[in-house]
């Protein structure tokens, strides 16, 4: 059993205007959903000694502040730029996620930059609100945050684990567990990169 050092990830979550439309303008429904999501994410990261907290929630009530399109890499890039220029200067956080109601191309349900944690532009992720079951969406967020934290997919080189969090395809009955390979990837990321922003308790 690996012993991981205590780290803290303060999340900023932005719900796009499509989410506002999807939930009929009910911002309290979106807020409740996001809080439930973060509580699942927190639970999944606790074995790695990572405490995740929601440091801010933005709901784009009147309009999107970036162009949200079905090309996930373009949308993620735009969101990263916006986060770097706008959101970071407004409130401290370590990583920002855009929750979108837009259907993404190629049956993608999430995207994030590998090893991006603490970088002003690259510490971001994109998650589609792809299931009415909030736990399923939380697993996607946990998976994308894993990429930010240096984790690769559970596939090649004896790391296949179809039910694990970092499996390349979401399974219908997803596990809440990270594979040993994911834990090793995270440990390597901490050793090689030692991202400073996650050292501070919220």
Curated annotation (Swiss-Prot):
Pfam families, A to Z: Reprolysin (PF01421)
Q: Recall the taxonomic lineage recorded for the source organism.
A: Eukaryota, Metazoa, Chordata, Craniata, Vertebrata
Q: What is this protein called?
A: Snake venom metalloproteinase TM-1
Q: Keywords in UniProt for this one?
A: Disulfide bond, Hydrolase, Metal-binding, Metalloprotease, Protease, Pyrrolidone carboxylic acid, Secreted, Zinc
Q: Give the cofactor note.
A: Binds 1 zinc ion per subunit.
**Co-factor(s):** Zn(2+)
Task: Report the family membership.
Answer: Belongs to the venom metalloproteinase (M12B) family. P-I subfamily.
Q: Where does Zn(2+) bind?
A: 143, 147, 153
């Amino acid at each position: 059993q690996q012993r991981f050092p205590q780290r803290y990830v303060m999340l900023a979550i932005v719900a796009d205007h499509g989410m506002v439309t999807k939930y009929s303008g009910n911002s309290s429904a979106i807020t409740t959903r996001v809080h439930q999501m973060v509580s699942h994410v927190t639970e999944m990261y606790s074995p790695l000694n990572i405490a995740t907290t929601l440091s801010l929630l933005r709901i784009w009530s009147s309009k999107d502040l970036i162009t949200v399109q079905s090309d996930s890499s373009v949308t993620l890039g735009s969101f990263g730029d916006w986060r770097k220029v706008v959101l970071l200067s407004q409130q401290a956080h370590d990583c920002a996620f855009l929750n979108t109601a837009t259907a993404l191309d190629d049956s993608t349900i999430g995207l994030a930059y590998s090893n991006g944690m603490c970088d002003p532009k690259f510490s971001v992720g994109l998650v589609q609100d792809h299931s009415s079951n909030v736990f399923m969406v939380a697993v996607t967020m946990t998976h994308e945050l894993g990429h930010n934290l240096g984790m690769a997919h559970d596939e090649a080189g004896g790391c296949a684990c179809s039910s694990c969090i970092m499996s390349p395809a979401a399974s219908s009955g997803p596990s809440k567990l990270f594979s040993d390979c994911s834990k090793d990837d995270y440990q390597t990321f901490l050793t090689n990169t030692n991202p400073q922003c996650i050292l501070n308790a919220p």
